């Protein structure tokens, strides 16, 4: 009789912004539980995330989420092999709640502690769809980041292009306020865009520049100026057309840069991840344009339910570090400005 390999169970924490999430992940690719306590209703009246409010909610929810995650997965602390936690980037107060909870569990139950980069977690949300094949390019689009990340192996990240000002998700929320769309605005604007037409032809910043960086501040300004000018002269603008024109500009730039980078960096897979990866307009364009331009590059879209912040993605990224004994200790602290050089040369 052959031996049965032990299953590795990781308890994973995510608290970088406005979701408190704890998950139990088996072998890096199977979700046994993924409990998420969202704070959207608390932040909606402010039109965005208020750090102090976020921290308070994390404190209230973290223990409840831990208990629910273990119960839903039908496991106990004794069954766990490690604890993974987002330690950056994000809101420092919010991060500290998750980091301290994870450190407490790891210490109390003598488990290895795995510090995970939040943005790596977003990429590894796509790992639940299928195994990664390298080299790989990730288009990472979220509220705080817009990046093209090249991976030659698990745990190795090279930023090829990034935003020079506003991230795409940030621009969505800002123009959402102008349109009177409640926070978070991304999903509603996406729906409005599908009902409208690109009639305003907003600028596509940096689309022809010889680099892979992004800029969305000019688009945001053009949008706001268009709306304000209409208000001043008493003109009525179609909000669906405004949304469609804004989204067309964002998607055109993301697509142009992504297809261009794939010419210089041939890859086996392209991963779309991050909160804005839930955008149907962007998903549709990638599904339409990538096969025509790069038929040998496989597109992996992060599952819709895992595009937002969640513990499962942290467990998936953490499992890679677990396999290579990339552990933290009791001195682990939150790093709100953490960048992608978090594991230099892990798999040389």
Curated annotation (Swiss-Prot):
<dbReference type="InterPro" id="IPR043129">
    <property type="entry name" value="ATPase_NBD"/>
</dbReference>
<feature type="binding site">
    <location>
        <position position="186"/>
    </location>
    <ligand>
        <name>substrate</name>
    </ligand>
</feature>
<feature type="binding site">
    <location>
        <position position="279"/>
    </location>
    <ligand>
        <name>substrate</name>
    </ligand>
</feature>
<feature type="binding site">
    <location>
        <position position="309"/>
    </location>
    <ligand>
        <name>Fe cation</name>
    </ligand>
</feature>
<keyword id="KW-0479">Metal-binding</keyword>
<feature type="binding site">
    <location>
        <position position="190"/>
    </location>
    <ligand>
        <name>substrate</name>
    </ligand>
</feature>
<feature type="binding site">
    <location>
        <position position="173"/>
    </location>
    <ligand>
        <name>substrate</name>
    </ligand>
</feature>
<comment type="similarity">
    <text>Belongs to the KAE1 / TsaD family.</text>
</comment>
<dbReference type="GO" id="GO:0061711">
    <property type="term" value="F:N(6)-L-threonylcarbamoyladenine synthase activity"/>
</dbReference>
<comment type="function">
    <text>Required for the formation of a threonylcarbamoyl group on adenosine at position 37 (t(6)A37) in tRNAs that read codons beginning with adenine. Is involved in the transfer of the threonylcarbamoyl moiety of threonylcarbamoyl-AMP (TC-AMP) to the N6 group of A37, together with TsaE and TsaB. TsaD likely plays a direct catalytic role in this reaction.</text>
</comment>
<dbReference type="InterPro" id="IPR000905">
    <property type="entry name" value="Gcp-like_dom"/>
</dbReference>
<dbReference type="GO" id="GO:0005737">
    <property type="term" value="C:cytoplasm"/>
</dbReference>
<dbReference type="Pfam" id="PF00814">
    <property type="entry name" value="TsaD"/>
</dbReference>
<dbReference type="InterPro" id="IPR017860">
    <property type="entry name" value="Peptidase_M22_CS"/>
</dbReference>
<dbReference type="InterPro" id="IPR017861">
    <property type="entry name" value="KAE1/TsaD"/>
</dbReference>
<keyword id="KW-0819">tRNA processing</keyword>
<feature type="binding site">
    <location>
        <begin position="140"/>
        <end position="144"/>
    </location>
    <ligand>
        <name>substrate</name>
    </ligand>
</feature>
<feature type="binding site">
    <location>
        <position position="122"/>
    </location>
    <ligand>
        <name>Fe cation</name>
    </ligand>
</feature>
<keyword id="KW-0408">Iron</keyword>
<dbReference type="GO" id="GO:0005506">
    <property type="term" value="F:iron ion binding"/>
</dbReference>
<keyword id="KW-0808">Transferase</keyword>
<feature type="binding site">
    <location>
        <position position="118"/>
    </location>
    <ligand>
        <name>Fe cation</name>
    </ligand>
</feature>
<dbReference type="GO" id="GO:0002949">
    <property type="term" value="P:tRNA threonylcarbamoyladenosine modification"/>
</dbReference>
<protein>
    <recommendedName>
        <fullName>tRNA N6-adenosine threonylcarbamoyltransferase</fullName>
        <ecNumber>2.3.1.234</ecNumber>
    </recommendedName>
</protein>
<keyword id="KW-0963">Cytoplasm</keyword>
<keyword id="KW-0012">Acyltransferase</keyword>
<dbReference type="InterPro" id="IPR022450">
    <property type="entry name" value="TsaD"/>
</dbReference>
């Amino acid at each position: 009789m052959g031996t049965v390999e032990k299953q590795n169970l990781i308890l994973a924490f995510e608290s970088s912004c406005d979701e408190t999430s704890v998950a139990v992940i088996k072998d890096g690719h199977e979700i046994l539980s993924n409990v998420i306590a969202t704070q959207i209703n608390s932040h909606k009246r402010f039109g965005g995330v208020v750090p102090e409010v976020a921290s308070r909610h994390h404190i209230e929810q973290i223990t409840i989420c831990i208990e629910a995650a273990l119960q839903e997965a039908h496991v106990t602390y004794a069954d766990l092999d490690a604890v993974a936690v987002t330690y950056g980037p994000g809101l420092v107060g919010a991060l500290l709640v998750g980091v301290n909870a994870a450190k407490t569990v790891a210490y109390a139950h003598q488990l290895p502690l795995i510090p995970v980069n939040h943005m790596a977690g977003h990429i590894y949300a796509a790992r639940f769809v299928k195994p990664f094949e390298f080299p790989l390019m990730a288009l990472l689009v979220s509220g705080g980041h817009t990046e093209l990340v090249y991976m030659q192996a698990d745990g190795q990240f090279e930023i090829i292009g990034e935003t020079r000002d506003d991230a795409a998700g940030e621009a969505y929320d800002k123009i959402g306020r102008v349109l009177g769309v409640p926070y978070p605005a991304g999903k509603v604007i996406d729906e409005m865009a599908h009902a409208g037409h690109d009639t305003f032809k907003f600028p596509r910043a940096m689309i022809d520049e010889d680099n892979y960086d992004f800029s969305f501040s000019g688009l945001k300004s053009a949008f706001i100026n268009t709306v304000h000018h209409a208000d001043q002269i008493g003109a009525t603008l179609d909000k669906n057309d405004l949304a469609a024109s804004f989204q067309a500009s964002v998607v055109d730039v993301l697509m142009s840069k992504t297809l261009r980078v794939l010419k210089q960096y041939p890859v086996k897979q392209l991963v779309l991840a991050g909160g804005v990866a839930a955008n149907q307009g962007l998903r549709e364009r990638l599904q339409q344009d990538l096969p025509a331009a790069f038929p040998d590059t496989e597109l992996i879209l992060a599952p819709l339910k895992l595009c937002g912040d969640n513990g499962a993605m942290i467990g998936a990224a953490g499992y890679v570090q677990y396999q290579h004994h990339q552990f933290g200790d009791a001195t682990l602290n939150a790093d709100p400005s953490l960048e992608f050089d978090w594991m230099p040369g892990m798999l040389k």
